Amino acid sequence: MPYKAFISYSHAADGNLAPAIQYALHRIAKPWYRLRSMRIFRDQTNLSASPGLWSSIESALRDSEFFLFMASPTAAQSIWVQKEVDWWLSNRSAQSFLIILTEGELAWDNTLQDFDWSITTALPHRLSKAFTEEPLYIDLR
């Protein structure tokens, strides 16, 4: 796959943090002779002018090994982010869906084996029952 990961985020909430995450991932264990250690897709660095925005995004999703979701209440409400999440869950395993919590709340209910939606604000409800066990996530709040 051309991309190791696809970064899904809200420009309003994480427009400054997403480029930093991409930059850091490019630099992890980078051999001196390579430009980057892995290719990471982020809309503002990998998309060019095109008559079909969604088809370009869908192509990048198809070509990505992991989905990095920068979780925030703003991202959870974003129509574009929800489309990306829907595509990933319909075409890939939740095992390759990684969560980076940037703001808001995320809570797991061990009894229900699902997120506690009365507390969780940073995830779209489409993730209800998507995971078979509590996901380990990175908390950057």
Regions found by a protein language model. Name each.
Residues 1-70, 88-95, 103:
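Conserved N-terminal substructure of TIR/SEFIR domains
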Residues 4, 90, 94-141:
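Juxtamembrane regulatory segments of integral membrane proteins
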Residues 14-16, 76-79, 105-111:
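Short catalytic/ligand-binding loop motif for oxyanion handling, primarily in non-cytosolic enzymes
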Residues 15, 81-87, 117-119:
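Short secondary-structure transition/capping segments
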Residues 28, 50, 76, 83-84, ...:
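Acidic, low-complexity intrinsically disordered regions
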Residues 45, 51, 78-79, 136:
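Flexible, active-site-adjacent loop/turn segments at secondary-structure boundaries
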Residues 73-92:
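Conserved TIR/SEFIR loop-to-helix hotspot centered on a Trp-containing motif
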